[in-house]
A protein has these predicted regions:
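Conserved non-cysteine loop/helix-boundary elements of the Radical SAM core domain that shape
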Residues: 2-115
Length: 115
């Protein structure tokens, strides 16, 4: 598997992702079942982005939702809103069968009942 992580890979243009994958592919043989994951922030999404990154080989997303609660997102200084998080996940489900969510539990005021 190849994992583009660190929180900001979704700032890369699809052509840049392709360039990196091509560079790695010159030195390593990829399995036909390779999993190529891209970490993304919800606020980096724009129409056509998922189709474009799939076209260059990304077949799994890891989405940095962090929380679906507005006040927690504000405490974390996240750029997206809770509604943005829900909207992006609806788009993710339309385009990817394989994805993960990064969620943060334990913010002040969090509790299991609420979650």
């Amino acid at each position: 598997s190849i994992y583009f992580g660190g929180g900001t890979p979704s700032l890369l243009r699809p052509e840049e992702i392709k360039y990196l994958l091509d560079a790695v592919g010159k030195n390593f043989r990829f399995s036909s079942a390779i999993e190529i994951t891209l970490e993304m922030n919800p606020d980096d999404y724009f129409a056509g982005y998922f189709d474009a990154i799939k076209k260059v080989g990304v077949n799994r997303l890891s989405v940095g939702i962090q929380s679906f609660f507005e006040e927690e997102l504000q405490q974390m200084n996240r750029a997206h809103t809770a509604q943005d998080a829900y909207s992006v996940m609806e788009e993710v489900k339309k385009h990817f069968d394989n994805f993960s969510l990064d969620l943060i539990y334990g913010m002040p005021g969090s509790n299991l009942k609420r979650w």
